[in-house]
Amino acid sequence: MPGMEAENSNASRAEELKQLANEAFKGHKYSQAIDLYTQAIELNGENAVYYANRAFAHTKLEEYGSAIQDGTRAIEIDPRYSKGYYRRGAAYLAMGKFKDALKDFQQVKKLCPNDPDATKKLKECEKAVMKLKFEEAISVPESQRRSVADSIDYRSVGSGPGSSYVPTKTTAVSAAAALMGVLVVYMGTKAATMVAAAASAALLVVLITFLWGRCSDGFFTKSRTLELEVEPQYAGARIEGDVVTLDFVKKMLDDFKNQKNLHKRYAYQIVLQTREMLRALPSLVDIVVPEGKHFTVCGDVHGQFYDLLNIFELNGLPSEDNPYLFNGDFVDRGSFSLEVILTLFAFKCMCPSAIHLARGNHESKSMNKIYGFEGEVRSKLSEIFVELFAEVFCCLPLAHVINEKVFVVHGGLFSVDGVKLSDIRAIDRFCEPPEEGLMCELLWSDPQPQPGRGPSKRGVGLSFGGDVTKRFLQENNLDLVVRSHEVKDEGYEIEHDGKLITVFSAPNYCDQMGNKGAFIRFEAPDMKPNIVTFSAVPHPDVKPMAYANNFLRMFS
């Protein structure tokens, strides 16, 4: 009986902790909620609800690997608990693992056949999978892909090709087959839809015939006119000749502040000029800060343009005497990502030494497709800019070393010891990030409080301890690691016995986290970090993720 009383007491206390965790979650205190759910699990580890709730909190912190683990554990405890599949499916979706997500949402639908929410999410997931299959079918091998940047000459108004590749006959048939797959899913087998299905099949025959012929006659290699002519009525910022000036940048910032777009011609010019500069850089860039001068490092901005302007208000505009390093994740989630990236690129064009840019995990096609940048670019500019930005992001350096003392990288360190700076310099970065290896780990890894290495809470990269940081610094004669990649309540966090600093520059992330932003100023020659924090500023009434995929917004 005493054992039963203790068990009942534990179960009762676990329920109390769950309620406290739920309250913390409602207050957007997701880390606190995770701690409380964990305490509940320690008292009662066979309650599927606790794991599903903790999975949801992990998802809010973008810890999708941990969310998948918790969802899986909830399913193991109770295979008929729909929320376990639901939470795991949502995490798979956020990672772009649509096929895995589809299996989970099919199971949710099976367990809850009359739930309209489950039906809606299953349909969205089916759309995502069909779109993925279609894109896979029409994708072009890297060896056949042409550079869209090389096809654009912004100086030649009204000319230039508008496509970066030529479809083959195989691609044409594959695309048609993929479209047929989409029709099969959405038309179903009901008699009422058979007429529509037949009509669509006829259209597919026409499509195949058209593509088959056009792949041979040069149709896809002919130029499409780019709309580069600046209309007389255009009243926005203008670049005179090839030189991006401070006056132009200031005018552009004022226009952006008032939600006015930059003309496509000047957007092309800025992006293409930036590409040329970035291509010439090594994968690891050495920065020299002269004695008596300072240097500022910023973390993730994530499309929060008005907070970026606030950084410049607090710390001055980028210039040769006031240089910055923005440490990746310029875009996605925030709905002013285009304004952010054009601002950073314009300053790079104005004065290359005024601003340095590092690649983050969100400077990639897979992330941009899900988290809003691709949709925003397509809405505000055009489809060709989607391809162009993807190319330019592949040119971004992966890491920087300041005055041979401070190593700056978006994510973190490595799954093996002995990595030297020369190994990072040798990385061929001109590609989409791989799912493993040094490049992946530079962009995705996170520190952990315990020594050694562990699995990534994100499901990509790894977690590394203070001993790993210490060895890396010693082996490369460095003093400090600065990284970004994680929301911190105060905008920064100092870890690993002061040898690692996380800096995050997007305050009140996604309009809901309530965190501060921060940046770090280093003064030469001692290069001691001076951390400045700041709060979010108002922005126009455009919600974060406004351009993201529908299915992701449904889980936000």
UniProtKB/Swiss-Prot annotation:
In terms of superkingdom, the source organism counts as Eukaryota
Question: Which keywords does UniProt give here?
Answer: Cytoplasm, Endoplasmic reticulum, Hydrolase, Manganese, Membrane, Metal-binding, Nucleus, Protein phosphatase, Repeat, TPR repeat, Transmembrane, Transmembrane helix
Q: Could you tell me which species this protein originates from?
A: Solanum lycopersicum (Tomato)
Q: Which Pfam families match?
A: Metallophos, PPP5, TPR_1
For the keyword Iron, the answer is: no
Question: Which amino acid positions bind Mn(2+) 1, per UniProt?
Answer: D300, H302, D329
The annotated modulation of its activity is: Activated by linoleic acid, linolenic acid, oleic acid, and arachidonic acid (AA).
Task: List residues binding Mn(2+) 2.
Answer: D329, N361, H410, H485
Q: Which gene encodes it?
A: PP5
Can you quote the domain comment? TPR repeats are required for the binding with phytochromes.
Active-site residues (renumbered): H362
InterPro entries tied to this protein: Calcineurin-like_PHP_ApaH (IPR004843), Metallo-depent_PP-like (IPR029052), PP5_C (IPR041753), PPP_dom (IPR013235), PPP_phosphatase (IPR051134), Ser/Thr-sp_prot-phosphatase (IPR006186), TPR-like_helical_dom_sf (IPR011990), TPR_rpt (IPR019734)
Query: What is this protein's record name?
Result: Serine/threonine-protein phosphatase 5
How would you summarize where this protein is expressed among tissues?
Expressed in roots, stems, leaves, flowers, and fruits.
Oligomer status and interactors: Interacts with PHYA and PHYB, mostly when they are phosphorylated and in Pfr forms.
Claim: Endoplasmic reticulum is one of the keywords in the record: yes
The transmembrane residues are 171-191, 192-212
- What does the record's cofactor remark say about binding? Binds 2 manganese ions per subunit.
Catalyses which reaction? Answer: O-phospho-L-seryl-[protein] + H2O = L-seryl-[protein] + phosphate; O-phospho-L-threonyl-[protein] + H2O = L-threonyl-[protein] + phosphate
